[in-house]
Amino acid sequence: MKTKLSRRSALQQITGGAAALAAASSLSHRLIAADEATGAKLKGRINHSVCKWCYEKIPLEEFCQAARGIGLQSVELLLVKDFPTLKKYGLACAMVSGVPGGINSGLNRLENHDKIVKFFEETTPIVAEYGYPNIICFSGNRASMSDEQGLENCAIGLKRVAPIAEKYKVTVCMELLNSKVNHKDYQCDYSKWGVALCQRVGSERFKLLYDIYHMQIMEGDICATIKANHQYFAHYHTGGVPGRNEIDDTQELNYALIMKTIVETGFKGFVAQEFIPKRPDPLASLKQGVGICDV
C-alpha cells in the first residue's frame, strides 16, 4: 500500500529521466502490442493485478492500456473516482484504497472508528456495484500501545464494519506491513497478530492482505505460512527482497514456488505486483514479473 511520501519518493529516485522513460514506455507498448497481435495468453491459474502507485509517471489511461496488453485483470490501490477509467478498459480494481487515516492512523485507535466506518458505509456499495472484491484497511501505528490493546481496538472497529461488508459481499482486508524497514511502528506487522485479529472479528468478510515482501522482512517462512494460514489471506502482494525492486533473480525470493504454493491452496483471488521497477523500462519489468508469477 502506498504511503504519502515514502513510496512516491522512492519511485522518483529510481525512475530514469523523462526522455529515457518515454523511450522505454514506447518500447514496452510495442512489445505488448506484439503480444496482443500474436494472441499471447497467460495460464489462468493466477488472477494478476498491479499496484498503480509503482508507475506514477505513467498516466492511468495509458497504464490501463499497457496492463491489458500484458494480460492483467486489475489495476489496484485506486479510488472510486478511478473506477470509470478501469471499466472503460475492462479492468477491475482488486484492492480499493481511500480509507481515512491511511497506514499510520488506523483501527487500533477508537477515536478513528467513526470516520472509518463512515468511509465503508459510503464506499462499499459503490465497490459492490462495480463488482470489485476488496477494500484495504490498516491497523495504524503502535505509538506505545500494546499488541493486545491494538487487537481489541481493531476488533471493535471491524465488528462495526463487517456487517456492511457482509451485506454487499465485499471483503475488508488489513494489510500486513513490515515495521523494520518501511513502516516503523506499524502494528499489524506479523501474520500471527493478523490471524488472531481475523479470529476475533469472526467474519468471512474480514481477512488479511498478505504482502510477501513485507512478511519476508519480518518473519520469512513464506510458503509454510501460506499453507498454514491461507484461509485468512484474501489477497497477495509481491516485491523483491531486499530493495522492493524486480522479483527476478536479483533478489532472494523464489516467486515461482510461492505462486505454486498459493495455487495449491485453492486460492481464487488476486496476486498484485507491488515492486518498484529499478530498470529504465518499467513496463518490461512489470511484464517480466507477471510472467514469473504465471505458474
PLM features per residue range, with description:
Residues 84-96:
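Short acidic, glycine/proline-enriched helix-loop-strand junctions
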Residues 63-82:
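Catalytic domains of carbohydrate-active enzymes, especially glycoside hydrolases
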Residues 54-56, 79-81, 99-101, 141-143, ...:
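Active-site-proximal loop/turn and secondary-structure-junction residues that shape catalytic pockets
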Residues 49-57, 104-115:
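Active-site mouth loops of central-metabolism enzymes
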Residues 14-26, 40-42, 106-207, 217, ...:
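Active-site acidic/histidine proton-transfer and metal-coordination neighborhood
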Residues 2-68, 132-133, 188-210, 214-295:
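Histidine-acidic metal/acid-base catalytic patches
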